């Protein structure tokens, strides 16, 4: 079995969640499968093994799980990017586009130092609004965003292309055509 099929087979698809017409790609089944989880993290880390990566930034909430594992393997620090109002210390924030409206994310102002090399991690990229906001937030405080990594890309929704337009290399382990 190929890597792509192996990982795809551990992702559960839930139709009509959170609303009719949506196919929700659920990675909790991948996370529960020790072999698949390990393999996915190894593949996310592989291009940067031996490179100088200072921090891994994970987008709330599944990006925390994956980002922590990636940071551990790269011997890098981990930085949570959270919804506004969830961090206790002084923060820097960025608004980002949602399918219907906007939201705001933030991180601690001292979590990344100017010039530090950062990899952004989340479970899935769809329209790219959240990831684009995270890249802009990291750049706002002077980080060099080396890449953005995801388990899943939904290429028909254009998010990866949006990040590439910002000169951010994108690594996704699998893709699901359609929504």
Swiss-Prot record:
Q: Which GO terms describe its cellular component?
A: cytoplasm
Q: Which UniProt keywords apply?
A: Cytoplasm, Glycosyltransferase, Purine salvage, Transferase
Reactions accelerated catalytically = AMP + diphosphate = 5-phospho-alpha-D-ribose 1-diphosphate + adenine
* Any one GO molecular-function label of the UniProt entry: adenine phosphoribosyltransferase activity
Which regions span the lipid bilayer?
Answer: none
**Pfam families found in the cross-reference section:** Pribosyltran (PF00156)
What pathway is this protein said to act in by its record?
Purine metabolism; AMP biosynthesis via salvage pathway; AMP from adenine: step 1/1
Matches recorded under HAMAP family: Aden_phosphoribosyltr
Q: How is this protein organized at the quaternary level? A: Homodimer.
- Tell me the protein family, please: Belongs to the purine/pyrimidine phosphoribosyltransferase family.
What's the protein called, per UniProt?
A: Adenine phosphoribosyltransferase
Gene name per UniProt: apt
């Amino acid at each position: 079995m190929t890597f792509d099929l192996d990982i795809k087979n551990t992702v559960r698809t839930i139709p009509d969640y959170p609303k009719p017409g949506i196919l929700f790609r659920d990675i909790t089944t991948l996370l529960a499968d020790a072999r698949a989880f390990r393999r996915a993290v190894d593949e996310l880390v592989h291009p940067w093994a031996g490179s100088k990566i200072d921090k891994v930034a994970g987008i709330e909430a599944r990006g925390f799980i994956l980002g922590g594992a990636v940071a551990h393997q790269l011997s890098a620090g981990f930085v949570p990017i959270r919804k506004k109002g969830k961090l206790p210390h002084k923060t820097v924030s960025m608004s980002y586009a949602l399918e219907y409206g906007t939201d705001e994310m933030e991180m601690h102002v001292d979590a990344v130092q100017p010039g530090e090399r950062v990899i952004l991690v989340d479970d899935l990229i769809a329209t790219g609004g959240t990831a684009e906001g995270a890249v802009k937030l990291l750049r706002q405080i002077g980080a060099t965003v080396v890449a953005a990594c995801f388990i899943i890309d939904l290429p028909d929704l254009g998010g990866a292309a949006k990040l590439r337009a910002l000169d951010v290399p994108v690594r996704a382990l699998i893709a699901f055509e359609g929504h």
